[in-house]
Amino acid sequence: MKIAGLDIGSTGCKLTIFDSDGSCLGKAYRDYPVKRTKTAHEVEAQDIIDSVFEVMEEMGRRHPDIAGIGVTSFGGTFVLTDKAGCPLHTAMLYTDPRGADECRALEEELGSAEIAAVTGLKPHGMYSLPKIMWIKGHWPEVYRRAEHILLMEDFVVFLLTGTAQIDYSLATRTMAFDINTITWNRKILSVAGVDERLLSRPVPSGTAAGTLLPEAAKRTGFSTRLQVVSVSQDQVAGAVGAGVFDSGKALECAGTVECLTPVYDGMPPLGGNAPGQLRGRPVCGAREVRDLLLFLYRGRADTVVRGHPGKG
């Protein structure tokens, strides 16, 4: 049996095929342009889904018989779509400065202690909810037309299967998810003025969304029997892949941001955060995992390297 992992990153996506012994049979990667200015950090959601179909088509020609594909993605970034999943705007990256004022307004109304107790997060504009508020305030027509608010994992899963579901670990990156009840928090959403109906249904990590839609199967070369699974936020998946299952172990991962993902036997006390540190609590099955993020300034090194080939 062959299975595949599809990871949606902030600058590119990768599809890797494995056999039942865990041996890598092949991989495909596509990057997509990210636009960064002083006032906006953006990526075209359509570029992401086009790249997803490109890597699936490449692997579909070589390994059309895979049984399932698990989807992971980076957190925070989302897109408002119409009923069919077509993007209504350019997606804001989690590093986008917009949403800071909206986050402060939420914090003033609810208090940082209440937000932290519910979501496990110190309020910050990097999370989805303040940016959704920004869109509602600045692009009201986009919000009015929206039928879905999708983060990148559930965006891809929805377009592949027609099912709008988001795993718990990625839902925590919105600042609207209650880690105690593992549901969307209606009070926070009400204060934010965001309709819960637009959000995907939260499900445990590793929940199958369904089989590949006929049009997606035709485009990629995979079977309509292919199962698509909502796996997790990328750092949680990385910890599992590194064998970090037991309390006292952690994964340190350096990418666009520096992440430390430790495992706990139970929910640790909130405590205080050092300046610049942000925390989330992805909840995966029976284990509680705290994802401690050090939010780093993202330089333009990738842009420089791409713009000057052979000089870096």
Residue ranges and their predicted role:
Residues 3-5, 100, 107-120, 130-165, ...:
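Active-site core segments that coordinate phosphate-bearing ligands/cofactors
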Residues 32-38, 114-115, 165-172, 194-198:
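Gly-rich Lys/Arg/Thr-decorated short loops/hinges at beta-loop-alpha junctions or inter-strand turns
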Residues 1-89, 117, 217-218, 222-227:
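N-terminal glycine/serine-rich phosphate-binding loop of ATP-dependent small-molecule kinases
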